């Protein structure tokens, strides 16, 4: 099921949430809408679902304009950040709910419903919890049950609104890897909203970077990271440094893309060591370049030669190994 977003705009009073958005999502693709709070990503997801109405523009599913269709007629599965499970129902009944609510002529028999529910619970690896209640589950388990419930009605499109946002970091990492594997198995056109760059990079086939109601860049994780369209995309997709040049330009580079030396070396810049911070396998060194207010951060392996006996206040020499040259604004 392909999705086309055509010239979609949405305003809430004086706030322009979306401004002439155009986006094509291929059938079977997993796309991340990535951006900071207030960028319009959740509004766009809700418009695709039919939960919000655009002021202008169209939503097309597989060649059919569904802009005037009610959310119930779009056949989408929606997974919210906070699970939205029915607390008074067992896991089994939560997953079965959508099937039991179908019109009488479309409703499967109870035996078919039971078969489908157990199939989905096995798929999310939680069939052994079928008789439990939501409060007896961990956050990660609840979110997997919410996903199984969304898939029970066999939607054409799966939409996920920050599905892992309410979970702790370790569970989030496990679940996003699980979701990527699951998507490979079910091959269902899916769109998920996130503000977590690492999550988008790890899970999505393509990333749509949004800011202030517009799309800044669309591309594969590798494309948006290695070939950012502008300063905003570069900074939003990871830690970054800015080094001013004398000819009205500056260069952008990542902390892990820095060469360090204790000795003055050709092509290296002198800087004062302001902080040395061990981070496990790596160490972050914060540097101050004379004449520049912005600090430079470098991350190197913890046993790097330049770190031996290094102390704050000393002079260290650095060189960006990979950089992007940008004109000053």
From Swiss-Prot:
GO terms for MF: ABC-type sulfate transporter activity; ABC-type thiosulfate transporter activity; ATP binding; ATP hydrolysis activity
Alphabetized InterPro entries for the sequence: AAA+_ATPase, ABC_SmlMolc_Importer, ABC_transporter-like_ATP-bd, ABC_transporter-like_CS, Mo/tungstate-bd_C_term_dom, P-loop_NTPase, Sulph_transpt1, TOBE-like
CDD domains the UniProt entry points to: ABC_CysA_sulfate_importer (cd03296)
Cysteine disulfide links: none
Its membrane topology: Peripheral membrane protein
Cited Pfam families: ABC_tran, TOBE_3
Main location: membrane
Keyword flag Nucleotidyltransferase: no
Catalytic activity: sulfate(out) + ATP + H2O = sulfate(in) + ADP + phosphate + H(+); thiosulfate(out) + ATP + H2O = thiosulfate(in) + ADP + phosphate + H(+)
Localization annotation: Cell inner membrane
Record GO cellular component, one term: ATP-binding cassette (ABC) transporter complex
ABC transporter domain residues: 3-237
Residues that hold ATP according to the record: 35-42
UniProt keyword terms in alphabetical order: ATP-binding, Cell inner membrane, Cell membrane, Membrane, Nucleotide-binding, Sulfate transport, Translocase, Transport
EC annotation from Swiss-Prot or TrEMBL: 7.3.2.3
SMART domains, per database record: AAA
Keyword DNA damage included in the entry's annotation: no
Domain of life: Bacteria
Biological role: Part of the ABC transporter complex CysAWTP involved in sulfate/thiosulfate import. Responsible for energy coupling to the transport system.
UniProt cross-references to NCBIfam families, sorted A to Z: 3a0106s01
Subunit structure: The complex is composed of two ATP-binding proteins (CysA), two transmembrane proteins (CysT and CysW) and a solute-binding protein (CysP).
Similarity-based family: Belongs to the ABC transporter superfamily. Sulfate/tungstate importer (TC 3.A.1.6) family.
Protein known as: Sulfate/thiosulfate import ATP-binding protein CysA
Organism: Pseudomonas putida (strain ATCC 47054 / DSM 6125 / CFBP 8728 / NCIMB 11950 / KT2440)
